[in-house]
Each structure stands twice: as structure tokens, then as C-alpha cells.
Amino acid sequence: CQEKKPEKTVEETGCEIAVIAEGSGEADISVTEATWKSVKAFADEHELAAGKYEPEEASEEAYLKSIQQAVDDGAGFIVLPGRSFETTAYKAQTSYEDTDFLLIYGVPHDEKNNYATGANTVSVVFAEEEAGYLAGYAAVKDGYTKLGFVGGKEIPEIKRFGYGFVQGAASAAEETGAKVELAYKYAGTFEESDEVKELAAGLYKDGTEVIFACGGLIGNSVVKAAEEAGGKVIGADVDQSGLSDTVITSAEKGIDSAVTTVLKSYVNETFVGGTAFN
């Protein structure tokens, strides 16, 4: 099956594995891309049909409509990549009991924050603070002493990245005796914009050598600022070295490993729902 938009009429395709895209430009967009890449690679290897469904808008109603389309196309396994799918997953796991779900980056809950992971659902959450710690530690060990952190919005996972980055840099500074300076900023958005680029450019102008950019598409803006200023960037979520030579490393979450592990359990008929793991 090919990529589909729910507003179009789609014939039955026998799509076995579906990914519902979070296409609003929010923090989860890089997670969506990484998830789809992993799903497509797994499906191709196992000769299974996989499809990515792009909702009309970023809303629970649109997400559920895309899930219905995937089920109608024959999907037995649906991946929901991003925290914005938490309430959607909560409803879908009950409405489609014969379909297995993988929720990346969240745990199903209702509007009142009552959490429940159904018997047909597995949730995967990540320890961003650990990836952030390693990024900060490595940066100082590599000789960088003027660091910057630019997060998207102040949501828990972005904060965990930032806190880990600070702690990792502090640990390396203690070991090496280096005097480390760290500028800590939030962009207030997950979008690529001139404002984010200007924020990063200001940090580079003030002497920041490398910026850890966390949050959706803001990394693109930070990279542009780095290219103009001769600065460096640390990516987040997935390997972002392909964006630019300014990206020296990335704080990866291991999305590919998580997706592959759960998909293997699905095809081997050993899938056990009702669980959440890191």
C-alpha cells in the first residue's frame, strides 16, 4: 500500500502495518519520520505491505479517521508515533480490539489523565535525560566549553533532554577541570522559523561553540545559524548528521530498535500488550 490521505477514497490494499503520521510540525515530527523509516525497512525485509497515513489535521478526530482507514485497508498492526496520540490510542485500543497498536513516546490516557494500556497495545517511552547526559558529557570531553541548549516548548521530554545535557556537561567539566559556560533557552515553538534562527545566531555571536537543538523542526533553524556563524550543532531524537556538516553528533533515542523489537513480536505471534517499556 502507498501513502494515503484519509480524505481520498482508497481501495482495499491488504496493508498489514500502518503508521499514522503526526504532520503538524510539532516535536514528534522527527519521531514520525524515524518510525516510518524503521517500519518500512522491517516490512520490506519480511515482505509485508506497509502504509503511512497522513491525517487531514492535527486533531484526535482526524487521527481516529486515519486509523479507521488503515483498519479498513486491512491493517493488523498500527503504529502511533508521538505524545499527541495518547488520547487517540486510549480510544482506538478499545474500538479496534482485533488490531494491535504501538504507541511511541507516550502512554494511553483519557482526557482526565486516567492511564490504561490495553491488552492490544504496547507503549514505548524514552529516557531523554540519558541521551542528553551523553551529549553534554561528550561535548565537554571533545573540548567544547561554551555550550548552548535550545529547546522547543517546555514539555517534559524536552526538559529531560536539557537537564541531562546540563548534568553531563557538569560531570565532564568536573573530570577534566574545564570551566564550562552554558546558555539555556526555549524557542517556544517546534517550527522552523527566522525567530529561532535569530535566537541561535545570538548565542553563537555571544561565543557559544555548540548548540544542542531539541524539538521538531527548530533544529533546521539552528543548523542554518551555525552554518553562517561557523558554529556546531548537536541533534536530537534521530541521527541528524545528514542535515549539515555542522552537526557533530546526535542524542538518539533508539526508535529503530524499539519499533523493530515490537514488530518482531507481532510477526512471531508473541506480541504481549498491556505493557509500557523504556
Describe every region a protein language model picked out.
Residues 4-278:
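A residue-level marker of the well-folded mature domains of exported/periplasmic proteins
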